[in-house]
Amino acid sequence: MGELRGAHVPVLLERCLELLSPALDRTGQTGRTVYVDATLGLGGHAEAILTAHPRTMLVGLDRDTEALAHARVRLARFADRVHLEHAVYDELPDVLDRIGHPVVDGILFDLGVSSLQLDAPDRGFAYAQDAPLDMRMDQSRGVTAEEVVNSYSHPELARVLRVYGEEKFASRIASAIVRERDRAPITSSAQLAELVRQAIPAPARRTGGHPAKRTFQALRIEVNRELAALETALPAALDRLAIEGRMVVLSYHSLEDRLTKVALADRVRSKGPIDLPVELPGTGPTFRLLSRGAELPGEAEVAVNPRAASVRLRAAERLDPTQQQRQRTDRERYRRQVRAMHQPGTGSAVRRPVSGDDGTGTDEEGEGHDD
């Protein structure tokens, strides 16, 4: 286990605690709640949750064995409430079934590359450091970035850079990679970063940060199958939340945030026919959004933790179906009273019953209202 460089600052820690705490404060019949950190990393968020909620049990997942080792040390004082697993987040349902916690109360996804991985000089994630082209979050399995850049065809490389890096010079960069590897294999992050810099037109290099940023992001996503795993993991995680359970997702680029937005929007919309006067049982929203769109970090957060600059937070809570049914009944009773009022010979005033704001209203983009 390598030494950590600098202090680890969990991103949007106070906001995550604020959003997850209502779900973790409910102990129910078992006398405890279960919190899943699907991307445990160095355990900063988990430590804060366990400290604030002494009746909460942690299930922590991470594909990086080095991160798990650091987190195990950090969380040692909570050992009787901690269960750590070497797993990717799309394996969450299998993990929960195996350990006997099929339903949980809170889930956090803190996506992207971790501080440990960025700072480790031998992992190859950072374009500012010279290191072997590895980029695997789990160094025990999978292909490396070196294998990708030296074996993928030009069309395959261009697709990866264009789709996962949103790189507009994808084809030019892919051509430069193919030309260079024909002379000698590309083996280091510094070699690749310089190759990308030279492939991008000079005017474009002067804006948008380091020229290799998008290429390194794209290769990392390809190597670790990040988006494919996330697309599977988000709906599966929502399915495992208890009533009034909550999930928070921190994403760091538009592709992650888009998948999160789609997964949540699917659960906060009615599935019933739009032309029916009433909502059919089982077709209403099953979740409500806890944030208005994607929340951004404040200036103070970014000043303390510059790596939080690109974060986008989204959160949702599972609704109680019995409460939803009561609200549907109230709405139907009101409609009947209105119809009766407009019948010949009636003239009594109708007062609409007051129903609680369930926060399920969304626009076409899937955005909701503040909690």
Swiss-Prot record:
Predominant location: cytoplasm
Function: Specifically methylates the N4 position of cytidine in position 1402 (C1402) of 16S rRNA.
EC number annotated for this UniProt entry: 2.1.1.199
Biased composition (Acidic residues): 360-371
Region (Disordered): 315-371
Key words of the record: Cytoplasm, Methyltransferase, rRNA processing, S-adenosyl-L-methionine, Transferase
Family statement drawn from the similarity comment of this UniProt entry: Belongs to the methyltransferase superfamily. RsmH family.
NCBIfam families per record: 16S rRNA (cytosine(1402)-N(4))-methyltransferase RsmH
Taxonomy, superkingdom: Bacteria
Location relative to the cell: Cytoplasm
Any single biological process term in GO: rRNA base methylation
Name of the protein in question: Ribosomal RNA small subunit methyltransferase H
Annotated GO MF terms: rRNA (cytosine-N4-)-methyltransferase activity
Catalytic reaction annotation: cytidine(1402) in 16S rRNA + S-adenosyl-L-methionine = N(4)-methylcytidine(1402) in 16S rRNA + S-adenosyl-L-homocysteine + H(+)
Disulfide bond residue pairs: none
Alphabetized Gene3D superfamilies for the sequence: Putative methyltransferase TM0872, insert domain, Vaccinia Virus protein VP39
Binding-site residues, S-adenosyl-L-methionine: 43-45, 62, 96, 110, 117
GO cellular component: cytoplasm
Keyword rRNA processing: yes
